[in-house]
Amino acid sequence: MNLANKLTLLRVILVPFFAFFMLSGDIVPYSYLWAAIIFAVASITDTADGKIARKYNMVTNFGKFLDPLADKVLVVTALICFVELGWASAWVTAIIVAREFVVSGIRLIAAGSEKKTVIAASIWGKLKTASTMVAICVIIIMHILVDFGAITAEAFPVQLISDILMYISCILTTVSGIKYLWDYREVLKTDA
């Protein structure tokens, strides 16, 4: 297994530790800080694995499969933790998670089609990813600040900001999902 794939695999391995610290705020001191550090390391591996794979000609089918899967597992885990903690609405999270499954399904169908179509990320998909990652990071940081007493949830609109960020992510997620369905409807018709 090459270095790029090891970094991708590390991201998957970090997910349960991230979830543990996110959900152990009552037991582990500074658990949100630890979760943020793990999320940051996982995010860095996401950038590093692709750059290393391309620069050193380490692109593999395993990496092409595992990299987007690792991203989805990390983001979906964060969003589920947010719902459990009351930081995000279940319906917003459900829309984001459903879109991930739908687009992944479209990609699998396209890749398995006669034309072996590879679906690249669209600008809407990139905006969706960026908005979701920003939302996750900002929401965790706000709760770290509350945890450390730097701000209070009563004086600072933590939940309102969290909701706005998640709604923006949800809107971009919905637009992106509809665009994928529209752009690749022929692939779906052919293989349905």
Task: Please place each PLM-identified region on the residue numbering.
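Alpha-helical transmembrane bundles and membrane-interface segments of multipass inner-membrane proteins
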Residues: 1-192
